Regions:
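Short alpha-helix in the alpha/beta-hydrolase fold that links the catalytic acid
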Residues: 42-45, 145-146, 170-180
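A conserved short beta-strand
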Residues: 127-140
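Short beta-strand/loop motif that positions the catalytic acidic residue
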Residues: 154, 159-162, 166
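Gly/Ala-rich beta-loop-alpha elbow adjacent to hydrolase catalytic centers
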Residues: 109-114, 118
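Serine-hydrolase catalytic machinery in alpha/beta-hydrolase-like enzymes
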Residues: 2-105
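Acidic catalytic loop of the alpha/beta-hydrolase fold
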Residues: 36, 141, 164-170
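Hydrolases whose catalytic domains are alpha/beta-hydrolase-1, hotdog thioesterase
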Residues: 117-121, 143
Length: 183
């Protein structure tokens, strides 16, 4: 079976920016919005987190969602959207690196669906990053999904934030995410 064509999903969507121009920045914060939100809305965080020399980048999901179903659904159910979303984040990271910013100076952050996508991207592309900020999210897939990711985060700072009574994000998934990312 041929791989699904992901080029028409999230690729080509806008990439919003704030802060220092990428070519002049010493570091980057990639912000990933949640379902129903926009790149512009999450980029507003830059106003509350001003850091000289930091480029803030926010990719836009097609139709305001990175994938159609809950992050707890089987991975196949969210395809090909999930693969496209992960590829889009990878494109943004590559763009930042091409501007001369080392991975250790790149922080990925997200809220809700964006937090899930940021955590999944970092887990699948493990290396030393500047950090991971995941608010109200966790690794993608149902309970029992193999988490045999290769690589190591090598001391990447990770902040996972979530209510212990969130109706959409089980505390156990946040704890599992923390354990996987700590390996």
């Amino acid at each position: 079976m041929a791989a699904p064509d992901i080029s028409s999903l999230h690729q080509g969507q806008p990439l919003r920016a704030a802060g220092s121009p990428l070519a002049e920045a010493a570091g980057a914060l990639i912000l990933i919005h949640g379902r129903g939100a926009t790149a512009e809305s999450i980029l507003e965080l830059a106003d509350f987190l001003p850091q000289p020399g930091l480029a803030y980048l926010a990719p836009q999901a097609a139709n305001y969602a990175w994938y159609p179903y809950s992050f707890l659904e089987p991975l196949e159910r969210n395809e090909p959207y999930l693969s496209s979303a992960l590829a889009r984040v990878g494109e943004v990271v590559a763009r930042v690196e091409a501007a001369g910013i080392a991975p250790e100076r790149i922080v990925l952050g997200g809220f809700s669906q964006g937090a899930c996508l940021a955590a999944e991207f970092v887990a699948r592309n493990a290396r030393r990053y500047g950090g991971l900020l995941a608010f109200s999210g966790g690794l993608i897939g149902p309970s029992g999904t193999p988490r045999d990711y290769t690589g190591a985060l090598d001391g990447t700072p990770v902040l996972l934030g979530c209510s212990d009574v969130d109706p959409h994000i089980p505390l156990a998934r946040v704890e599992e995410t923390a354990a996987v990312l700590a390996r």
